[in-house]
């Protein structure tokens, strides 16, 4: 199967040399998602550098920015898979999921987002939010391809 969509899992507030115990699991989930999309991670020192990166994303279609935000829309895994599948079917080339800075996203960043997505009302550590997002991307890919991973939910 040819894969034409790219997914980037970005996070803000990266520190050079910082240790992230979740990184191997994040990479594992993203590698396993390759049936639907090419996946990668990106780290940014600030929201400003992330927004500059967003401005430079070009292709046949504009990049879709999904910001994880406590005020965002909550979805079931099935609804998220349907949303991701619809973007794929529309021909979207690049979807960027981003975990924001510790102080939260600015109003300007929220306005640039195509979707604000929330895991719920609880506050979640940024590294854990990245892991949860990577797992949900993988789960969505398995739902879209009929893989049994999600069937035991």
Question: Would you name each region that the model predicts?
Answer:
Residues 95-108:
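Short glycine-rich, acidic/polar surface loops and turns
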Residues 107-153:
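Structured adenosyl-cofactor binding patch, chiefly the S-adenosyl-L-methionine
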Residues 30-34, 109:
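Short, conserved catalytic or adaptor-binding loops enriched in Gly and charged residues
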Residues 15, 70-73, 101-104:
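Short glycine-rich anion-binding loops that position phosphate/pyrophosphate groups of nucleotides
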Residues 2-30:
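N-terminal beta1-alpha1 ligand-phosphate binding loop
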Residues 34-96:
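S-adenosyl-L-methionine/SAH cofactor-binding core of RNA-modifying enzymes
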Residues 1-6, 56-61, 152-153:
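Short, low-complexity, intrinsically disordered N-terminal peptides in bacterial proteins
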Residues 7, 38-42, 116:
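Generic structural signal for residues in well-ordered beta-strands
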């Amino acid at each position: 199967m040819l894969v034409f969509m790219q997914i980037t899992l970005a996070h803000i507030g990266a520190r050079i040399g910082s240790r992230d115990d979740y990184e191997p699991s994040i990479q594992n989930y993203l590698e396993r998602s390759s049936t639907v999309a090419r996946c990668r991670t990106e780290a940014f020192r600030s929201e400003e550098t992330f927004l500059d990166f967003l401005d430079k994303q070009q292709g046949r279609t504009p990049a879709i920015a999904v910001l994880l935000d406590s005020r965002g829309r909550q979805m079931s895994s099935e609804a998220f898979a349907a949303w991701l599948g619809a973007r794929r079917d529309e021909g979207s080339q690049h979807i960027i999921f981003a975990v924001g800075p510790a102080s939260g996203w600015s109003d300007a960043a929220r306005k640039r987002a195509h979707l604000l997505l929330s895991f719920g009302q609880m506050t979640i550590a940024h590294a854990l939010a990245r892991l949860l997002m990577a797992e949900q991307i993988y789960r969505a890919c398995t739902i879209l391809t009929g893989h049994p991973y999600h069937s035991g939910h």
